[in-house]
From Swiss-Prot:
Pfam hit, one: Aldo_ket_red
This protein's name: Methylglyoxal reductase DkgA
PANTHER family: 2,5-DIKETO-D-GLUCONIC ACID REDUCTASE, NADP-DEPENDENT OXIDOREDUCTASE DOMAIN-CONTAINING PROTEIN
Binding-site list for NADP(+): 187-241
Function noted in UniProt: Aldo-keto reductase that significantly contributes to cellular methylglyoxal detoxification by catalyzing the NADPH-dependent conversion of methylglyoxal to acetol.
One of the protein's GO biological processes: methylglyoxal catabolic process
Binding site for substrate: 107
Listed transmembrane segments: none
Complex and partners: Monomer.
Similarity section: Belongs to the aldo/keto reductase family.
Record lineage: Bacteria, Pseudomonadati, Pseudomonadota, Gammaproteobacteria, Enterobacterales
Catalytic machinery residues: 51 (proton donor)
Protein EC: 1.1.1.-
Catalytic activity, reaction form: hydroxyacetone + NADP(+) = methylglyoxal + NADPH + H(+)
Native organism: Salmonella typhimurium (strain LT2 / SGSC1412 / ATCC 700720)
Length: 275
């Protein structure tokens, strides 16, 4: 079995290409989920202030027998905290029981309140101080990203966006790549695979490779060069989602999955959300 792949970000830092997402997990659930994830080989955990489970993540990491330098921990600046990124980060670090973050992401642009450029400037300062190794954004459209770059000169290393076979965001993914921004997929299985796992091409590939539909979709993300963070609190699923290193999809198979794109957004519209 091949080793889990690592992605080098434009700032020189590296991160695992596959991590565990913990959206909707309670503080109790997340402890068991992370314990299982570390056991099967995950080293990247993606949480957020808005998930209200940073304390559980912190407890799980504290109890883990994995060295801190082997872990890649992400949390996110919530919309209400865009005017106070320093305080928000310090609160997150305290809950996570960490001295530094590997990746700090601005959760949404919230153009209605228009604080995202100033929030980004605050995040740049936090990176310079060493409190975070890398900084990026979530749910930013091209015009939001361009404004950050134009007004600060600092490009996010990550843009974490809704991305799955029904919502492939190829234009944004390509723009990110042109600007050396790594695209990361949230809701990578389209919220449990509805409308995806039952697609003929997904089922045929699952049969061909002896894999589950979820494993086929995760492998699609990996083979498209995306960082991917499937969410689960079920031990068997956590293990299943990581067992994707012993096969690859070929160019034609990736092309067939590309045909599933409907531009079907399951989450909020970044131009409208918040405020």
């Amino acid at each position: 079995m091949a080793n889990p792949t690592i992605i080098r970000l434009q700032d020189g830092n590296v991160m695992p290409q596959l991590g565990l997402g913990v959206w909707k997990a309670s503080n109790e659930e997340v402890i068991a989920a992370i314990h299982k994830a570390l056991e099967v080989g995950y080293r990247s955990i993606d949480t957020a202030t808005a998930y209200q489970n940073e304390e559980g993540v912190g407890k799980a990491l504290k109890a883990a027998s994995v060295a801190r330098e082997e872990l890649f921990i992400t949390t996110k600046l919530w919309n209400d905290d865009q005017k106070r990124p320093r305080e928000a980060l310090q609160e997150s670090l305290k809950k996570l029981q960490l001295d530094y973050l590997d990746l700090y992401l601005m959760h949404w642009p919230v153009p209605a309140i228009d604080h995202y450029v100033d929030a980004w400037k605050g995040m740049i300062a936090l990176q310079k101080e060493g409190l975070v190794k890398s900084i990026g954004v979530c749910n930013f459209q091209i015009h939001h990203l361009q404004r950050l770059i134009d007004e600060t000169g600092v490009t996010p290393v990550i843009n974490q966006i809704e991305l799955h076979p029904l919502m492939q965001q190829r234009q944004l993914h390509a723009w990110n790549a042109t600007h050396k921004i790594q695209t990361e997929s949230w809701s990578p299985l389209a919220q449990g695979g509805e409308g995806v796992f039952d697609q003929k091409v997904i089922r045929e590939l699952a049969d061909k490779y002896g894999k589950t539909p979820a494993q086929i979709v995760i492998r699609w993300h990996l083979d498209c060069g995306l960082v991917v963070i499937p969410k689960s609190v079920t031990p068997s699923r956590i293990a299943e989602n990581f067992a994707v290193w012993d096969f690859r999809l070929d160019k034609d198979e990736l092309g067939e999955i590309a045909k599933l794109d409907q531009g079907k957004r399951l989450g909020p519209d970044p131009d409208q959300f918040g405020g």
